[in-house]
């Protein structure tokens, strides 16, 4: 349900139903592998039973990844490249019933409804390159460099860089 959790005054819907589909394709050879994955989701909530949120439209979400890995001419060494988009709401909105004024003589509040979009301002794209060394006696060393464009799907966010490493010993 795309982490739609609410409690108390905000618990307006009680349930949400999500239909989610993922397609995976792989091409694997001795020295080269290619993988593609694409996910699509649709989430619908029940009718609102609260006063603050009056309606949530159907939410559509997507995610994808494309990766390639190949073995170098040096035994035990592999290089990889990947590009991906983490789960993102593509469209949908929530109707909010918000107070806009108050009549001082009757103490009655006036309300208006506004549609707030739930799709983020940007689209995060992650680009990653990596190196894997698989040595003898269970030793492996992986290093990856990643660059995130529009982190957290925020169009105003600066790009983020990450360096990851993993050492494994088996005995």
Residue ranges and their predicted role:
Residues 31-33:
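Detector for repetitive beta-architecture
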Residues 1-15, 20-26, 35-157:
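Outer membrane beta-barrel transmembrane domains
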Residues 78, 158-171:
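Outer-membrane beta-barrel "beta-signal"
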């Amino acid at each position: 349900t795309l982490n739609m959790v609410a409690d108390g005054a905000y618990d307006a819907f009680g349930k949400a139903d999500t239909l989610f589909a993922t397609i995976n394709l792989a091409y694997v050879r001795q020295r080269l592998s290619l993988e593609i994955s694409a996910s699509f989701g649709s989430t619908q909530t029940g009718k609102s039973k609260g006063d603050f949120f009056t309606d949530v439209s159907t939410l559509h979400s997507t995610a994808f990844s494309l990766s390639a890995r190949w073995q170098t001419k040096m035994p035990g060494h592999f290089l990889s490249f990947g590009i991906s988009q983490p789960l993102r709401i593509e469209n949908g909105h929530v109707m909010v019933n918000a107070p806009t004024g108050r009549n001082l003589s009757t103490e009655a509040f006036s309300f208006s409804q506004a549609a707030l979009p739930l799709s983020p301002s940007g689209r995060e794209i992650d680009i990653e390159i990596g190196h894997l060394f698989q040595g003898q006696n269970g030793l492996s060393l992986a290093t990856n460099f990643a660059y995130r464009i529009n982190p957290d799907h925020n169009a105003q966010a600066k790009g983020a860089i990450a360096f990851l490493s993993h050492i494994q010993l088996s005995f």
